[in-house]
Amino acid sequence: MAKKVKKNEEITKKFGDERRKALDDALKNIEKDFGKGAVMRLGERAEQKVQVMSSGSLALDIALGAGGYPKGRIIEIYGPESSGKTTVALHAVAQAQKEGGIAAFIDAEHALDPAYAAALGVNIDELLLSQPDSGEQGLEIAGKLIDSGAVDLVVVDSVAALVPRAEIDGDIGDNHVGLQARMMSQAMRKLSASINKTKTIAIFINQLREKVGVMFGNPETTPGGRALKFYASVRLDVRGTTQIKGTGDQKDSSIGKETKIKVVKNKVAPPFKVAEVEIMYGEGISRTGELIKIASDLDIIQKAGAWFSYNGEKIGQGSENAKRYLADHPELFDEIDHKVRVKFGLLEDTEESAAVDPAAAKADELVLELDDAIEIED
């Protein structure tokens, strides 16, 4: 019986060795034909953790789970008109430039306001801008920029404005069923591999439409077919909620709006989280406002009545004064921002690793003094 078992083990081992050799030969042939890295074992990849770029909003970074937009992925931002979609995208552009990257903006709507973009922190002198004549031209330009590998972020505003050339050349009233959907489907197939290879972030802004005759369920849909929905790793639903009234002389005026950004699809972290931000007219997302709100919830900033304080020091009476204080003290803003990100696991706690034990430091000083004394005696 023992001999039979041993013989079976030898046959299995021999068969396994032959399969392993056949696999190694196949991998060598594939590598020879298609280049190194065409097929690899998942554990051999140097970068298993998804690289991200901050969205420019702390609340949105937290909602995204990974700490920002994943690099080498497609992002879709959609919502009703004037909900803040372009504002969210422009904050990403400003962040990409802040990190030393190059950003491109495909303005298919021909409606980009350079002054507003600059107010959000975008360096308009360095921003690559294209206002294409047709959808095919816009997507082709985006493809060439992505293929270059030199662009970190490409924004397309918007998918609904990417009009196929056949529709432009035709007459108003002509029926062009499915043209835009086919164009977007082909573009996604061509762009997705290049986007992943070059680690470019591609943001597609989209509008909302309503399905005709829908009695039950959500009648809202996005134009451009289903391809973008499938290929997007992250989909954000941006909707304004309530108006923000001013203070003092502006108490009867609207100075901004509360906005909810819902992560309706997320392939790199759990979805369906919501970021609540304040979009101020002419300024964009209030970074100080969202920081005060989140830090107060975590008790990093303490609130007593109308007063806000940090580390026992008062930083303002009322949220507006606290916002101004943080805006005037960027070092303090960065310190609190870092603590919040550490709390949510978006950053490692560098303070703990950098902290020095006072007793150990004193011991090191004594050792150095002793060494100096010995050298003098010598």
UniProtKB/Swiss-Prot annotation:
GO terms for biological process: DNA recombination; DNA repair; SOS response. Gene3D superfamilies: P-loop containing nucleotide triphosphate hydrolases (3.40.50.300). ATP binds at residues 79-86. SMART domains: AAA (SM00382). GO terms for cellular component: cytosol. Keywords: ATP-binding, Cytoplasm, DNA damage, DNA recombination, DNA repair, DNA-binding, Nucleotide-binding, SOS response. Its main location: cytoplasm. Pfam families: RecA, RecA_C. InterPro entries: AAA+_ATPase (IPR003593), DNA_recomb/repair_RecA (IPR013765), DNA_recomb/repair_RecA_CS (IPR020584), P-loop_NTPase (IPR027417), RecA-like_C (IPR049261), RecA-like_N (IPR049428), RecA_ATP-bd (IPR020588), RecA_C_sf (IPR023400). One of its GO terms (molecular function) is ATP hydrolysis activity. It is found in: Cytoplasm. NCBIfam families: tigrfam_recA (TIGR02012). Can catalyze the hydrolysis of ATP in the presence of single-stranded DNA, the ATP-dependent uptake of single-stranded DNA by duplex DNA, and the ATP-dependent hybridization of homologous single-stranded DNAs. It interacts with LexA causing its activation and leading to its autocatalytic cleavage. Belongs to the RecA family. PANTHER family: MITOCHONDRIAL DNA REPAIR PROTEIN RECA HOMOLOG-RELATED (PTHR45900:SF1), RECA (PTHR45900). This is Protein RecA. It comes from Streptococcus equi subsp. zooepidemicus (strain MGCS10565). The gene is recA.
